[in-house]
UniProtKB/Swiss-Prot annotation:
Gene of this entry: aroC
UniProt similarity note: Belongs to the chorismate synthase family.
Task performed by this protein: This reaction introduces a second double bond into the aromatic ring system.
Name assigned to this protein: Chorismate synthase
Alphabetical list of PANTHER family matching this protein: CHORISMATE SYNTHASE
Pfam name, any one: Chorismate_synt
EC number: 4.2.3.5
Pathway: Metabolic intermediate biosynthesis; chorismate biosynthesis; chorismate from D-erythrose 4-phosphate and phosphoenolpyruvate: step 7/7
Positions that bind FMN: 128-130, 291, 306-310, 332
Natural source organism: Thermus thermophilus (strain ATCC 27634 / DSM 579 / HB8)
């Protein structure tokens, strides 16, 4: 399964083509739209989330509520485009452009992208580098999550800590309803209240905040990924996908950085066996991956999200046209997008997992894949 996205932040729409989905996957807009809604929620978001009401539209590959085996085409319209139609006009002659951006923003793609592609209006960088693109990747991830759900896999994204505040209530699958209702997708109401206070303070001061996001999956079969080739190792693929999220600057599988400061005897998960459970672990400090493959334990992917780079009290920069000192450009932005980023991490991790399932089990139809997964589960139980 592979996919491609297109579209700009203030263009008419976002687009995606997904190739390699099996025929017979039940799929409707209601499998995708709730994930788009989750991405738009979260305390600390900006006015753009008031304007947009993201809804997916199928353009190809789905008929009668099921995939046909052909490429699936998705679209999400940008409601804000009506306010930018003249500025984003693709027709020749639309130069010099209105609202040209020449003051590169520190922490953004503006300067490096401008130098790479020769743009003096940095809007040509900003529009595609924007995190708005992740709306479509969440839609693709929702399709992957639907496929995984039919294979017995469940995923969730949440926030273990942000704005310098750590949740003291550890994650539990029983807390998923609480996470879904939380404005910050946190497990701990007290930590949440303090984080909200800090978000309000940062907003009043024209500043931004980052945090830690985590995606968890249960129900995975062991053996997804491979130890044979470096590019098939699942932890590497998950890390690349996580680091492709705008503002994510670090990733770990399980408590990797904590593990790095301990002895091996304190870190590695002992192996046990019983007739009822087969092989299992009493701990999961590996985060569900060993040797580039799933172990069958819960998969834990954690990432660090830096504070958003667009500041209402901008940092010093230089104008790329005049080379004169200037304050960085200000665009409408969020104070924090950490809760939304946890949803994005879950969706994007699901894409990697769906790809791994399809690579291992193949099949042109969903029914074939389900049968092969069940036979594999039986073989693993008998191992």
């Amino acid at each position: 399964m592979r996919f491609l996205t297109a579209g700009e932040s203030h263009g008419p729409e976002l687009l995606a083509i997904i190739e390699g989905l099996p025929a017979g996957l039940p799929l409707s807009e209601e499998d995708i739209n709730p994930w788009l809604e989750k991405r738009q929620k979260g305390y600390g978001r900006g006015r753009r989330m008031v304007i947009e009401r993201d809804r997916v539209e199928f353009r190809a590959g789905v008929r009668g509520g099921r995939t046909t085996g052909a490429p699936v085409a998705l679209a999400i319209k940008n409601a804000d485009f009506k306010n930018w139609a003249e500025i984003m006009d693709p027709a020749p002659g639309n130069w010099p452009r209105k609202r040209a951006l020449t003051a590169a923003r520190p922490g953004h793609a503006d300067l490096a992208g401008g130098m790479k592609y020769g743009h003096k209006d940095l809007r040509d960088v900003l529009e595609r580098a924007s995190a708005r693109e992740t709306a479509m990747r969440v839609a693709v991830g929702a399709v992957a999550l639907k496929l995984l759900s039919l294979l017995g896999v469940e995923g969730v994204g949440y926030v273990p800590g942000m704005a310098g505040v750590w949740a003291k209530v550890p994650f539990s699958w029983d807390l998923v309803p609480r996470i879904e209702e939380s404005p910050l997708r946190m497990t701990d109401p007290e930590a949440e209240a303090e984080a909200i206070r800090r978000i309000d303070q940062a907003k009043a001061e024209g500043d931004t905040l980052g945090g830690i996001i985590e995606a968890r999956f249960r129900g995975l079969v062991p053996g997804l990924g491979s130890h044979v080739h470096w590019d098939r190792k699942l932890d590497g693929r998950l890390a690349q996908m996580a680091l492709s999220i705008p503002a994510v600057k670090g990733v770990e599988i399980g408590p990797a950085f904590e593990n790095a400061m301990k002895r091996g005897s304190e870190v590695h998960d002992a192996i046990y066996w019983s007739p009822e459970r087969g092989f299992y672990r009493k701990t999961n400090r590996a985060g569900g991956l060993e040797g580039g493959m799933t172990t069958g334990e819960e998969l834990v992917v954690r990432a660090a999200l830096k504070p958003i780079a667009t500041l209402m009290k901008p940092l010093p920069t230089v104008d790329v046209v005049t080379h004169e000192p200037k304050d960085a450009a200000r665009e409408r932005s969020d104070t924090t997008a950490v809760p939304a980023a946890s949803v994005i991490l879950c969706a994007l991790s699901a894409i990697v997992l769906a790809q791994a399932y399809l690579e291992k089990f193949g099949g042109d139809t969903m029914e074939e894949i389900q049968e092969r997964v069940e036979r594999y589960r039986e073989r693993v139980r008998a191992y």
